[in-house]
Amino acid sequence: MVLMEDMQNKDGHNTVENSSGGTDSNNNIQMRRMRKTQLSKKELFEKRKSDVLIAAKSLDTEIQNVKNLKRLSIGSMDLVIDPELEFKVNSRNSYSSDSSKESLQESLHEENIIRSEQKEEQGSEDNDAYEEGDATNVDDSIDITQTEYLHDEETLEKEKIIRNASSSTSSSARVTSRNRRLSGVKTLAHDVVLDVENDHDSKMVDLTQNLLWVPADQHPNVKPENYLELIQDTLQNIQISTNQDIDENKLELGNNHVISNRKRTGSVVRRPSRLKTSYTKFDDEPPLADKPQEGEIQVDKRISSSDIKTIRSVSLKEITEELTKISNNAGLTDSDAVTLARSLSMSGSFTNESLHLNGNHTENDNEFASNMFNETGLTIPERSSLRRSKFNTYKIRLEGSSLPQAVKLNSLMNIQTNDNRRSASSPASYTQVPQEQASLNDFHEIFDHYRRTSTDWSTENEKYVDSTNYYSDEEDLTHASISQESSLLSTDSSNNSVLIKPHNTGSMISEKLDQHVSSSEKSNTNNSEANHGWSWLNSSNGSLNANEQTYQQLTDDEDDEECVDNEKADFVNLSVSRRAKSTKRASERINHSKNRHSPIFQIHSEEAKSVVITPSVVSSSESQPSKPTAPAVVEKKVELPTDTQASTHKKNSLEKRLAKLFKRKQHNGTCKSDVKVIKKSVKKELKKKASHSSLSKFRKSPKKKPQEAEVERPSSPTKTITTEDIDTASVIEPEVRSSNASTLLPDSHTSHSSEFVVETISELDGDDSFDISGGDVNYDVEVHSSISRDTTAGLEEDIGAEREDNTSPTAPQISTLPPRKLTFEDVVKPDYSNAPIKFTDSAFGFPLPMITNSTVIMFDHRLGINVERAIYRLSHLKLSDPGRELRQQVLLSNFMYSYLNLVNHTLYMEQVGTGDIAFNGDSALGMMDKNDSDGTILIPDI
């Protein structure tokens, strides 16, 4: 005690003892008791600080663990930004320990004054009561500081009631307990009475000043390495003050951002994120001028802890309604599978907001994290995080074109036609002797044809065959050209996503441009097939622009140097006649969502039509092997039956799409020597990656080149030709057979070219996952194995027909599912563990794995379309987190594939239910023909 008194004397408290005069011993005893009380209070205060500091350190460790778990569980909001784009967003001043020091130093100074005043006021009170009340208050502060967040509200209320009852022995103790508190902690006792003026501020309590608990919306701004320092600074500045003093300083210490955010009624989209405020901060915060209005009425009110701490929770119903509102603003009003499938993609065409939002609306709900400006002035990329590292197949369309659609289409076709004429008239394409090797070694020419669609070439050819219908149907066909001008072709007013492969003819989800199907489709079907967008093939056809006779003679010259003379005429005949059906049927056939379920053997009527054409074609090719006029005659004969049976052709061409979808191109030489030439040149071409043959073999798509296949097929029924030629004629018609053997030949004509166009999709994609045909290897084997066999054409085609009948069903059966709710029996399990994944075609422009049990289960647990879309997009964000462990990435990927299978099958079921399916005929015509475009995979419009 002597030592303690010396310490007190050093502090200057001995002046009080000397002033008392030493005569009164009772006063000395009272002063000593006060010193004891104050000293024990200081010791307790220091002990409390040390305990809290220890707790803070352990809490910091726990917070680090929670932070790591949060990264795994919810993904980082940083993933709204493209992960490959490196920049930092610092839109708010970080909550640093320096700012907390300044604010708390002010409260420290003021509370020191208050403490001295309280000591003077209560010096004459009963010291026992003072000690009891003060200890009670300290205990209350300790409990609130350390353990409030560890208990539920009922436990806290019971403890506080007990403490309040124990402190009720003295009125002064109650006054002390009511008026004194920690600066950073809100006492939540039920006997606290406040005005409504203070009520609003109490609800908007300064969360950042809480001692040990940083609010969730402040976490990103308190760096983890500085968090312990923040706690230490706060502990050093803990003081006991009165509520009145705190109320006076509310405006200085309060977090106005939190207050204004809570005052805002807002919607779900507008509510500040508890994960990261930097992406949800808006500049249109209400001014602070209306804050005094909250406290104009003076009414005593008891405040419960639940009132202060309650933050309005958002129900699933509210989220669904909010997402519905957003979708309505975006024009996605329907809740069917078509809308969902169209809107699942996070990339694609982001249309101009003024088209469906009138441009002037700046409503809260139209601001999203994905297209919002940060305070740094940097815009988060619209494309979000759907980027491929190696094969970047996504491209945002340009939106600047305001030309009418027809004008854009016509101008584009003129440009492309001029380009075609230039490339067609180039002498290199004629001077090179072999048909197969013509221009094959020109690397740039190969990639030029990648940038063109078969519809570009068919446009050119059609212009000279049927000039009256030149633009009528081409508007349907050319809007998805993969050339550099193609980005102008899609309308910005549509909400469809467009997946464009930058320099290849690839699959894309395209929007429907035209609602009409013009009658020129018939002439297109007969005249637009031969070129298929290949510049080296077009070069042989390019002379049609000047003279059709010259074109035939040039082609005959090339064929003379390769093979026998009669094959020359065959090539000439069919190169023109088979121009008919390529582009139209190929583009129609690309909608995989419908074709995957369509019947395989429903194409006999169109074959029957072709039977009428075949005899004339064959006879002309046999009797006039070298006459240049043969193509024109054949072409006219081909046109007439198609014109007479236009409606039937429409229906059957739609039905043929599935049958041709899984077929691959066959390598073809016009004779055995050509086959050897191909084999020799394949190695060179593989190295150069510049020839069609090498590309098709590389991509597991061993189909024949269309024109070469055309050369031999007409003559095959009447004479013996090369075995590869014969086998190709049978192989190229995989899925479709008619009871009439004579239909085999025209079917091979009509089917092959469309297969060619579809093949360019998977062939140029650079990804073997698109090779979804199970019979690809068999086709390749057939081509090479049949080279060694010599027999008559009719016999070989019959054998090939039987073979193909066995092979063709297997490929489409991989993806054929009944138009009903799926069951576990529909799930096809692999034959053995770790078997190669089999992919099916889909409506999304990329293949999907086979359905799994997850897809079947999801049928019974469907959410709203907007909720499902949000979940899928959030899954994209999670999956793009580079720090996520592989197992979680696999689980996410499996879920997303299962969900896409669900949407794909639901889309198919809806189309069957409404009659909008390919084999239902004309009901699908209006929906599908207007989407015609080479290299596109279509999802129907709303």
From Swiss-Prot:
Bias (Polar residues) ranges: 15-28, 807-816
Residues modified to Phosphoserine: S50
InterPro entries: Zds1/2 (IPR040206), ZDS1_C (IPR013941)
Comp. bias (Basic and acidic residues): 99-122
Membrane found in the keyword field: no
Signal peptide: none
Pfam family, one: Zds_C
GO biological process: establishment of cell polarity; positive regulation of G2/M transition of mitotic cell cycle; rDNA heterochromatin formation; regulation of protein localization
Positions with biased composition (Acidic residues): 123-134
Biased composition (Low complexity): 483-497, 518-541, 617-627
Keyword Phosphoprotein: yes
Keyword tags: Phosphoprotein
GO cellular component, one term: cytoplasm
Function: Acts as a negative regulator of polarized growth via an alternative mechanism to ZDS1. In heat-stressed cells appears to play a role in localizing BCY1 to the cytoplasm. Seems to interact with, and down-regulate, CDC42. Also acts as a suppressor of PKC1. May act as an integration point for distinct signaling pathways helping to maintain a balance among these different pathways.
Subunit structure, as described in the record: Interacts with SKG6.
Note in the entry: 'ZDS' means 'zillion different screens' as both ZDS1 and ZDS2 have been found by a wide variety of genetic screens. Present with 105 molecules/cell in log phase SD medium.
Protein name: Protein ZDS2
Organism: Saccharomyces cerevisiae (strain ATCC 204508 / S288c)
Gene: ZDS2
